[in-house]
Amino acid sequence: MTKILDDIVAYKQQEIAALKQQKTEASLIAELETLTDAPRGFMRALRDCRDRGGVAVVAEIKRASPNQGLLREQFMPELLAQECVQYGASCLSVFTDTHFFYGDVAYLSAVKKAVPVPVLRKDFIISRYQILESRLLGVDCILLIVAILTDEQLQEFVVLAHDLGMDVLIEIHDENDLKRALNVPVRTLAINNRNPEDFNASLEKSAQLRQQLPKDYFVISESGINTHADVVYLLNCGLDAVLIGGALMSAEFAGEALHHLIYGKED
């Protein structure tokens, strides 16, 4: 792992330990027994959009990022979510990490109530506890980052998430991650175009890694997607969907920005 990811994991370990002091894993499991709602199909929504000939987009709702700083002064996740769905997002992603991305689980809960589309929890998941918590929060899909997990954790966490009815998105950064991801029983991958060491993004990473994956994998490109030309380039390279955050959150009107990214600006 890089120094940045090491720091994030160390902080997460402390965060989870504190959460367990407030509520035990056994308590979470007991609460899960009372759930009656079923998760929305995150992957199904993206596949359906792609198969209809549309541009499958995951719009990311986030307040800030380590490389860009604060993206929105006025941050109203429910309204942003509604706007993005209105303008073409098939699914949403919500950052719940508080320390590095100024996210919050409350943002995710608010978004789930505001829109009918599936929602991905964007966080650094390193524990069973977070997966159980995710289901209780109404999460439809969790993100597992290969670089911060062992092979054993990847297998265990995928099984647990699926047992709870949630979809799983596996995130990779490089060829080493890709090789490990091929051993995980999930055929939905996200290629993060950003270098975790310096945060520079290269769309060519998605193009190159996609060619090394089996054709039946559903592959999402994320990070550094800022223009309609970027979206067209990635789709032409065989990517199945795109996840867009910063370009939307930094725009005055997120929905209009999304429309332009999908369809291009009108003359």
From Swiss-Prot:
Any idea which GO molecular function terms this record carries?
Answer: indole-3-glycerol-phosphate synthase activity; phosphoribosylanthranilate isomerase activity
Q: Which Gene3D superfamilies match?
A: Aldolase class I
Q: Which CDD domains does the annotation name? A: IGPS
Q: Does the keyword Amino-acid biosynthesis apply?
A: yes
Which Gene Ontology BP annotations are present? Answer: L-tryptophan biosynthetic process
| Record-listed E.C. numbers | 4.1.1.48
Q: What class of enzyme is it?
A: lyase
Keyword Amino-acid biosynthesis annotated: yes
For this protein, the parts annotated as crossing the membrane are none
Pathway this chain belongs to: Amino-acid biosynthesis; L-tryptophan biosynthesis; L-tryptophan from chorismate: step 4/5
Question: What keywords sit in the KW lines?
Answer: Amino-acid biosynthesis, Aromatic amino acid biosynthesis, Decarboxylase, Lyase, Tryptophan biosynthesis
Q: Which reaction does it catalyse?
A: 1-(2-carboxyphenylamino)-1-deoxy-D-ribulose 5-phosphate + H(+) = (1S,2R)-1-C-(indol-3-yl)glycerol 3-phosphate + CO2 + H2O
Which Pfam families has this protein been placed in? IGPS
Family, similarity comment: Belongs to the TrpC family.
In terms of NCBIfam families, this protein maps to: PRK00278.2-4 (NF001377)
Protein name, per record: Indole-3-glycerol phosphate synthase
Source organism = Dichelobacter nodosus (strain VCS1703A)
